[in-house]
UniProtKB/Swiss-Prot annotation:
Function: Associates with the EF-Tu.GDP complex and induces the exchange of GDP to GTP. It remains bound to the aminoacyl-tRNA.EF-Tu.GTP complex up to the GTP hydrolysis stage on the ribosome.
A molecular function GO annotation: translation elongation factor activity
HAMAP family: EF_Ts
Cystine residue pairs: none
Entry keyword set: Cytoplasm, Elongation factor, Protein biosynthesis
The encoding gene: tsf
Superkingdom classification of source: Bacteria
CDD domains in alphabetical order: UBA_EF-Ts
Annotated region described as Involved in Mg(2+) ion dislocation from EF-Tu, given as residue ranges: 82-85
Protein name, as recorded: Elongation factor Ts
InterPro entries reported in the protein's UniProt record: EF-Ts_dimer_sf, Transl_elong_EFTs/EF1B, Transl_elong_EFTs/EF1B_dimer, Transl_elong_Ts_CS, UBA-like_sf
Length: 304
């Protein structure tokens, strides 16, 4: 068999658009025959799938699963190209499968997840006909007493995963605590909290905010020493905007979320702590390609 060189792999990738490892395998399977390797990739649907990977996948859905008595949960974002596909049964089933693989395999990274999934996503690309990407995921598992809760809003547009720790397993199982989890998830989804408490905000983020607030005060005509004093008050307002426990509760603006947690803890007779949360919004940060109308018409007519 001919030696498979890096140059051969690179040339096959350039011609087919397939992944590096797929190209290497194709060459190995065909004894280094370039044309046969191209055919092998096409037969496996890998060349077509790889070409689709060049298209922007900014639609999709955020999906969640919580199991094991609310002790183990997953939040995952899977992207595709169109809303039509995102609402289809095949894509929803794929999202659910990906989430269950995360629960079972406990991958530490996207690379590890892709390995655990095998050819599942590539097969879905070939079947559905769109670029599909598993973009990100988070997995929470309760170590002691506590519970995990997930909330999905608007057909998978926004998703939240939150973990609470509690004084005892009995407190975690209390209906009031389950209801609290849901209220907190709704709060995070709607008010876009970024951190649990002020202590969780990185020092560089606080310093950056201080610099901005000080510059704002000076631009308002305040002297530097006065501006410094103003920053102290304004940074507290910043915490109230980005920290979950400092936010006003959306259902009662006279009460902070932190006060709500303490109130429920008093009712159930045990300490409750918000350990962590994550909020995903479908497609956030993905730059969508802007097509003009003429290009769209040509594409739909099969001319482009």
């Amino acid at each position: 068999m001919a030696e498979i060189t890096a140059k051969m792999v690179a040339e096959l990738r350039a011609r087919t658009g397939a992944g590096m490892m797929d190209c290497k395998k194709a060459l190995m399977e065909t004894g280094g025959d370039f044309d046969k390797a191209v055919d092998w990739l096409r037969e496996k649907g890998l060349a077509a799938a790889a070409k689709k990977a060049g298209r922007v996948a900014a639609e999709g859905r955020v999906h969640a699963i919580v199991e094991d008595g609310a002790r183990h949960g997953v939040l995952v974002e899977v992207n595709c190209e169109t809303d039509f596909v995102a609402r289809g049964e095949a894509f929803i089933n794929l999202c659910d499968h990906v989430a269950r693989v995360i629960l079972q395999a406990r991958p530490a990274s996207l690379e590890a997840l892709q390995e655990a999934l095998g050819d599942t996503v590539k097969e879905a690309v070939a079947k559905i006909g769109e670029n599909i990407q598993v973009r990100r995921f988070e997995r929470y598992e309760v170590a002691d007493a506590g519970r995990v809760h997930a909330y999905i809003h608007g057909d998978g547009r926004v998703g939240v995963l939150i973990e609470l720790t509690t004084a005892t397993p009995e407190v975690a199982a209390h209906p009031e605590v389950e209801a609290l989890c849901h209220e907190l998830a709704l709060q995070i989804a709607s008010m876009r909290a970024q951190y649990v408490r002020p202590e969780d905000v990185p020092a560089q983020v606080i310093e950056h905010e201080r610099e901005i607030l000080k510059a704002q005060a000076i631009n308002e005509g305040k002297k530097p020493e006065i501006a410094e004093k103003m920053v102290a008050g304004r940074i507290q307002k910043f915490f109230q905007e980005v920290c979950l426990l400092e936010q006003e509760w959306v259902k009662d603006s006279k009460k902070t979320v932190g006060a709500l947690v303490k109130e429920v803890a008093g009712k159930v007779g045990g300490e409750i702590t918000v350990k962590r949360f994550v909020r995903y919004e479908k497609g956030e940060g993905i730059e969508k390609r802007q097509d003009d109308f003429a290009e769209e018409v040509m594409r739909q007519a099969g001319l482009k």
